[in-house]
Swiss-Prot record:
GO cellular component, one term: cytoplasm
Recorded GO MF terms: translation release factor activity, codon specific
Subcellular localization, as worded in the UniProt entry: Cytoplasm
Family from the record: Belongs to the prokaryotic/mitochondrial release factor family.
Record protein name field: Peptide chain release factor 2
Annotated TM spans: none
Superkingdom of this protein's organism: Bacteria
Listed InterPro entries: PCRF, Pep_chain_release_fac_I, Pep_chain_release_fac_I_sf, PrfB
Note, other: The gene for this protein contains a UGA in-frame termination codon after Leu-25; a naturally occurring frameshift enables complete translation of RF-2. This provides a mechanism for the protein to regulate its own production.
Lineage of source species: Bacteria, Pseudomonadati, Pseudomonadota, Gammaproteobacteria, Enterobacterales
Amino acid sequence: MFEINPVKNRIQDLSDRTAVLRGYLCDYDAKKERLEEVNAELEQPDVWNEPERAQALGKERSTLEEIVTTIDQLEQGLEDVSGLLELAVEADDEETFNETIAELEVLDGKLGQLEFRRMFSGEYDRANCYLDLQAGSGGTEAQDWASMLLRMYLRWAESRGFKTEIIEESDGDVAGLKSATVKIIGEYAFGWLRTETGVHRLVRKSPFDSGGRRHTSFSSAFVYPEVDDDIDIEINPADLRIDVYRASGAGGQHVNKTESAVRITHIPTNIVTQCQNDRSQHKNKDQAMKQLKAKLYEFEMQKKNADKQVLEDNKSDIGWGSQIRSYVLDDSRIKDLRTGVETRNTQAVLDGDLDKFIEASLKAGL
């Protein structure tokens, strides 16, 4: 005889979670109605007279279909599984019972994915993003730590199928990096990485210390979305200081021959962007301006939320963020200080295995 009560309880649990998503989390009825409207618009013969609008509608349809179709599949699947369980019990058929369990696993996975995607509800969560890394005080040790973080995030992005483009790298005095900016390209890049803003603390026996002593160093990460060119961010040219300089770091044999690198400082906020990945000063300036626009947008969003944030948690350091994760390599322990998630597989994390930390922070609503 089968243990059917645990299976019935699981079916009920999945049904309840699906109902929650269908209701206030996803607003299924409104999205289904909107999907029908979008489909009708896309079927109009003159829709491609406005290519940008047509593309926006296509993207909206894809998002709506993901939600509506998945919920339809979940509801139908749970109905089918309930019927399958009844058949298994009536026929005392172990094979059918096992098939029921397998189908539940598939449905649970689909539901989990949709629940997780619902955490990406921010205005720019679907956008590409920029990641700025800055070595803290500590000289060569901190600069080496910044380069380790860059490698870690590049590996993570590659593992998730994101494309990356290094916008700027400033070499350290002896080793590592003083700073770096990387663009991460792909759907939900910002949604995935937005909780990584903050200070990362490294504790290890320094390879740069002849005495092999333990050192603590810090590097900061700042993640901000790529914003549309038409977003309403006013930049007064009089507020800008634009410097050109010779590029450093990787870039080919011609990289240091001309002053093609560009640094832009927004004087009222002291926000700085820089780009050196192209040999054209003009292209580097355009890219740096695009980053400045994105940073100013993020700055304005943080200002709007600052009062609320202070009321909710006076301990949080708005802007670059407070310390978020500790990497103690001698003790083989990496711990997220916000969620409590930790692992002893330090090398895997430094090789880009960040999902457990990122998912926990997103689920915690950080």
